[in-house]
Every structure is written in structure tokens, then in C-alpha cells.
Amino acid sequence: MEKYPTRSKPDSATFAIPRRRLLGFGTVGLLAAAMPSLVGIGTAIAKPTPADERRLKQLVDEAHSRFATVGDGKNADYIPYLASVPSHLFGIAISTPDGKVIEAGDTTYAFAIESVAKVFTLALVMRESGPDIVKQKLGTNATGLPFNSVIALELHQDDPLSPLVNAGAMATVSLVNAANAEDHWRKISDNMNGFADADLPLNQAVYKSESDTNQHNRAIAYLLQTGNHMYSDAMEACDIYTRECSIGITTRDLAVMAGTLANGGVNPISGKRLLDKAYVPKILAEMAVEGLYDTSGTWQYDVGLPAKSGVGGGIMAVSPGNWSIAAFSPPLDAAGNSVRAQLAIAWIADQLKANIYAE
């Protein structure tokens, strides 16, 4: 079986610390208690101090220690490759606005990005065609049904409703301006690489595993075509979508990709603008509505951060204007969200008082 490469990482440490609330890092700015000059969502961000970074390191270490032994959930088994990924893997990473990544656990293990890719192809379409196309052709509402539901299409006259479910994601892929299939894939791959500031590999074993079992998505693609919601060849869009879900990504990569959204569309490492700042809130709104599938409302109620999950075990969350966090562990709950990743992100967000709906 083909293995994802494990990439080298800078200094990493081990885990453990007591639970306590210190920093107020969220709606009042990154680490506001320690850095009172920082203000508000989306404002200019100061460089974290060494003390701030030590505190973040303590938090990711403790979160890893707290939740590494949680045994709930199981790997996705409808995609054979995902069922074979070691269930004990668990990584957490925070990306700061000055380009540092603070991490614990298996953060260099490359896993399948799966549905998290939907966010970044949506960003590409917005960059090419503007945000209005999302409301006009994709939708901005939750389906109220599982992410791969055909019933949702039937109930809404083949309208995909959201770019963050499978139907809407394939429609999103079909909106990428491309001369041919090769150009189509190159644009999507280059866009992902830009958000990660890394060359993200297509894992052929995952791609084959998904292609051999994606009859359901092919049916959805044809339904979209029937309803005039597919804007390129239906099977080309389905195949490109399958490929983007098969990209290998590490927890570090995912934190940086989310950090680009937290940083107003500018990659915190490369300094390159990947998305107009005015479009970022629209992306985050989609994540809030449908980012964790049919438990998205519960996540917003409990945690209060825009987030996106994938059945490969990854979840990213964004504190707008401040920081981002990513976590990975393969065992999923019934909705398709990583159990350990949810616990880790929710606990760290609570420690940092990061709920964007709170004062």
C-alpha cells in the first residue's frame, strides 16, 4: 500500500500541563490579555511574544495529552484506504499570524484532505468570478441532511444549496475557469499549494480507492447536470473533485491553510495574498453554516468558531483576524467528524475564550 510521505518538522516538544484559562485570544485580538494593543476581529495583528508562544505550546501539548487516549469513533470504511490509516494518529497545530506553527503529536503525517478541500476551491472560484456567483449558482444554506445526500438535491429541484456538501463542491469545481481537464486540475492544485505554501502531493492510492467507490458522487454529478447546476463536463468535475479530496496534507499544512483565512487572505508564511480580504468573511460564513456537516449548528453553539472537517480525520478552525488551529485523527463520529480533533480544538478554543459570538 502506498504511504504518504512523512515530512520533517522544526522543533517539537512533548506534552502536559494543567487546565486553566489565561489568554483572551479571539474577538478581542490575538492573546489580548498578554498583548492589550491588539483589537478586534480582522484588525492588524501584532507579533506574538515568546511568552505567548510558550503558552500556546503548553495548550497544544495538554490538549494532545488529554485526548490522545480517547477511544470513541471509527475510521471511515466506505473508502478502503481511509479504513487502513492507523487509528492512533493524532496531531494538533496552531498557526500564528507571523508564520509560526506551534504543534504537538503526529503533525507531519500526511493524510487525505477530503472535504476540507472544498473550502479552498470555493476560494478559487470567488477569486476568479467574485462572491455573487456563490449565491447565484451554489447556495449559502445548510441542507439539513448528510454531506453526500441525494435526497437533498431531489427536495430542492437539484439545487446544491451549499458548496461545502458533495453536490455543491462538484458544482464549485465545475465553475473553475479552465481550458481543459489538465488545466482544470492544475489550477486547483496550484491554489491548494498556495494556501499551504507547500507542494501538496496527490496520493494515487487514495485517488484509486476513491475512484473505485465513487458511484454515488457520479450519480450526484449527473443529477446536477440534469438540473442545470453543472458548468463543465459532469464526469470531469466529479473526477477533479475526487482528485482534490485525495491530496495529501499534514496537520501543519492545514493549520497554515486555515491561517491564510485567519490572516485576511494572506498566507502567514509566504506573505502572498491568496484571496481578497472582503471575500474571507463569506468563506467563513459558509464554514459556520455547513463546515461540520449535519452537526455544524452544534459546533457553533458549543465552540463558536468557523470550521471545516473531512472524513480523512482533519479539522481546521479559524479565529478571524487572529489565528488558526488544525487537528487530525482518523476515528470519526456518526456525522463524519474526527472525535479527537473536535475535542482538542474545542478545549483549546475554550481555554483561549475564542468564541466569536462572545464579547
PLM regions: where:
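N-terminal secretory signal peptides
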Residues: 1-21, 28-37
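Penicillin-binding protein/beta-lactamase superfamily catalytic region
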Residues: 182, 211-214, 222-282, 333-338
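A short, well-structured edge-of-sheet supersecondary motif
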Residues: 68-104, 316-317
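Active-site-adjacent helix/loop patches that line small-molecule binding or acyl-intermediate pockets
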Residues: 48-66, 70-72, 125-244
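Short Gly/Pro-enriched turn/cap motifs at secondary-structure boundaries
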Residues: 82-85, 160-162, 212, 304-308, ...
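Active-site SXXK
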Residues: 99, 111-135, 257, 325
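Structured C-terminal helix/loop/strand segments within mature extracytoplasmic catalytic/sensor domains
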Residues: 48-49, 263-359
